[in-house]
Structures are given as structure tokens and as C-alpha cells.
Amino acid sequence: MRVHGSGVLAYFLAATVVAISVACSTASEQTAAAASTNGNPGLDTLTKANALERVVERTPPKPASGGTAPSFVPDPGWPKPLPNNWIIGDVGGLTVDSHDNIWVYHRPRALSSTDAGALGEAGKNAKGQPISAIGHPRPYGQLSGCCVPAPSVLKFDKAGNLLQAWGGPGDPGFLEKRCRPGDGCYWPGREHGIFVDHNDFVWISGNGEISRGTNSGEYPWAANFGGDDSQILKFKADGTFVLAIGKQGMTKPNSNDTNGGINGTPQPYLVADFTVDPKTNILWIADGYGNRRVLMVDAATGKYIGHFGAYGQNPVIGESTDPAYGGAWAADFRKGETKPKYFRSPLHCAELSKDGFLYVCDRGNNRVQVFKASDVGKPCQNPAGEAGKCGFVGELPIAPQTASGTSGSLAFSADPEQSCLYVADLTNFTIYSINRKTLQEVDRFGGGGRGLGQFHWPHKVSVDSEGNVYAGEVDGSANVQKFLRYGAAGCSGTGHAEVGKYRQ
């Protein structure tokens, strides 16, 4: 049953949504008490109840007629403030592990010089000029008292407590002692993609390119990563390096490579994201910004298992560097060419459902393609994009009228059937709730803005076992939010056949 307005508040209080109640209670009651003595009538009216109601009103449900979906409200107390004067940059990756811990993988080098003003001189650039650990000029040393970049990998519990932090330029000594080129470990130039598998191994990658300036080479540790990001790294949960797939420093794609990496592993290029199947221990890789394929490897050894492109085709046709297989989605859309035979950069996610279907975010083509996981990866031709061939099941356009970049990330609801598909639309700043059976939009939440419950480029979405949704943002937003689920546990009924149609 769906409730709205003051009914939402009543539902919350009846259901005792503890996380929000705790976040809003003590502070607002103390504030109200203090206000009665300082003469501020506005604060006199700020009570636990109406503070909660104000939060609820920020994310009203927008259900489709005939459809049912979970509703969400942002948790203003998640995560808790970071220690050590730390600050995070853009969120390149985010995942929830099997223990309901939330892992955030951020980009310290996305922080501006003033954001990371507490960093002093850490080395010299090629011109002998003093710079900070993330490459900003420091001719006079430290700029200010706030702040310093947190380590790139942050682990939180559901209450928002920070449990672990390691890796990257925000972790002094890590790049010199724990992720060393001599061991085959090159920390990414630009953090992108994290997953924690059923054995608690942490997988990360990156999409930095020296040729395009996203690896500037200015950092004191720049020799650690060489050329463009072209590795997938596997760590233990404490940050101990285990395995590398691919070799670092590639400068062009090869979407049909099977063994060009170190130790006989295949060669990825500018990887976006990945997931591991706990039943088969296959690592499914969205490969990605440079290559245009889904790559399959053994998660224990990194050895090649299979790969495929759009519509399940193997070999993959065309490369992102070939003008005949590129260009702008918007131009093709205007010409009515809405079924490209290739993934268009970036191929941004690969997520596996419990019932054996692989959902792939073809962000460059504003669509999600669906495959039967057991039927892909082998040589197969499907130039017409026929369902039932090469493991291809179907595809779902996501706001196809948008210039580019809608299908950025997706996750499944926590009900046993995983009946909802949550798709984060980067460009329209929205998360769609989609009935996975009908592929119709039954609700949406978010919307553009910088405030609580709003998004600017929701880059990654993930879900915990209670159905709460976590979203990380990029493009200067440098934000991660938790949305508490209430109401329905899953999606059902009919909705909008056109997912992402512009609506007020």
C-alpha cells in the first residue's frame, strides 16, 4: 500500500525507521530547547517530528498509475563525519558487500587545490616545482587547515561508521610499499569501479588516460602508473595486493584480446566496473571506456574465459578509435539509428541477477542490454540483434532522447525475486525504479540539485540486504548518499513503457 504526504510520516513513525529517527531526534530536540532561550522562534518549531517530515518531503514518490515500487527517503546522518581532517573526491565506485558493508572508492585527485588545502609539499614536478601529493602547486607550502584527501578505498557499516580506509595517494606509503610496480601493481591514475566478492576480495580498476590529460603525470608518484589505466587489481579486504589482470600502460584498445596481459591474463583497457558470480567464480568485466566488450575471466587466476560485444557478438566488431564505429549517440538517434551493433564508450556496468541474467549498462548508447549469462562469451554472430541468439535476451532504452550518458549504473532490489531494477541516469540526475518482469518504469527518485536527496551525476548505485539504496556522485559533486526504503519491498504492476521520458 502506497502512502503520501503526512501519511508517509505516519507510516515512518509506525514502522519505526530507526536510522532516520535517530539522525533527527536528539539534535533537533536539543536545538529546539536551546532556541527557546536564545529568542529564535524559527528554531522553536523545529521538532523531531517536523524535521523528519521535511526530509520525507524532499523525495516524494512519483509512481506510475497501476505500478508499485519501494519508496525512499535520504538518511541525513549517513555517513558520519570522517576522521583525520579527511575529505572525499568524486565517487568512482561504490558497492555493498555480502556483510552489508558499504565500500566507497573515490578520486582524491578530483579535489581542487583549495579542497585539499591542508596538503603541503610532497615532491617536485618535472620542472622542479613543489607540488602536493595529488599534484597541486605548493610554492608556499600548505594552503589552509582544511582538508586532506582520504584514502581511496573507504569501508562503512550501515550506520555510517568508517571501518577501514586504505589505498591511493591519500594513504601515505601505500603506493611505495603495498602496491608496487615491481609486484605488478600499478595504482590507477583515475579511480573507477569497485566490487567486493563472496570471498571478501576487493576488486578495483581505473579509467585514467595520460593522452587525454586525466593522468597528468604531475603527481610525485606518477611513475607508479605509467600510461593509460589498463589493469584490474585484486586485494584482500585489508589492502594486501593479490593479483593483477592485464599490464599497465596501454594506449589503444583491442576488444578481442585474450592473453595480452601479464601472466597470461587478457588485456583490459580503461575498465569501468565488474561483478563476480559466487556460483562460478567468474569475474564479469565492463571493459569499458577503451575496449567495448564484456570480458569474462577466472576470478582466482585472472585467466581468460570469454568475451562478447553488443547483442552477444564474438568477435567484437569495430573499435572506439574507428570513426565508422563511433560518433555521437545523439546524431545516430536523430537519424533513427537506434540499434547500434556495438557498445559505445563507455560500457559502464555489468550486473548479474540471481536468476542468471547479465544486465549491461551501454551508457554511450543510452540502453541496458540483457543476456543469459550461461550462453555468452563464445564465438557467435548476431548482426541483426535478434533475441534468442548469442545469449542476447533483450534491451531497454533509457531516456534515449537524451544526448548521452543515461544508463550509468544499475542494481537490483533486495526482495527474493529482485523484482526491481534501479537504473541511475547520470545525465538526468535520477534513479528509475523498473519492474524487472515488464521492463516498465514504475517510479523514480532523486532529481537535479546539490541538496539532500538530490543528485548531480549519480555515477554508481548499490543496494543492501534491507533494500536501502546507496548512490555515489561525480563531476565535482563528490557525494555519497543513503536512501532508506519504506513501503513496498519490490516492484509490480504496470508502468511507463518509455523509461526516462521527460516528466515534471
Give each language-model segment a name.
Residues G42-P76:
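Blade/loop signatures of beta-propeller domains
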Residues N101-W103, F201-W203, I282-A286, F357-V360, ...:
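Conserved beta-propeller blade signature
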Residues A150-L154, S230-L233, R293-L295, R367-Q369, ...:
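A short loop-to-beta-strand structural motif that recurs across blades of beta-propeller domains
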Residues F357-F371, G394-D443:
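Loop/turn-rich, solvent-exposed surfaces of beta-rich toroidal or solenoidal domains
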Residues W86-D97, V148-P151, D171-F201, T251-I282, ...:
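Beta-rich, blade/repeat-based domains predominating
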Residues P108-A110, G208-E209, Y289, G364, ...:
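Residue-level signature of beta-propeller blades and closely related beta-rich strand-turn architectures
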Residues H456-Q504:
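Blade-level signature of beta-propeller repeat domains, shared across WD40, Kelch, NHL, RCC1
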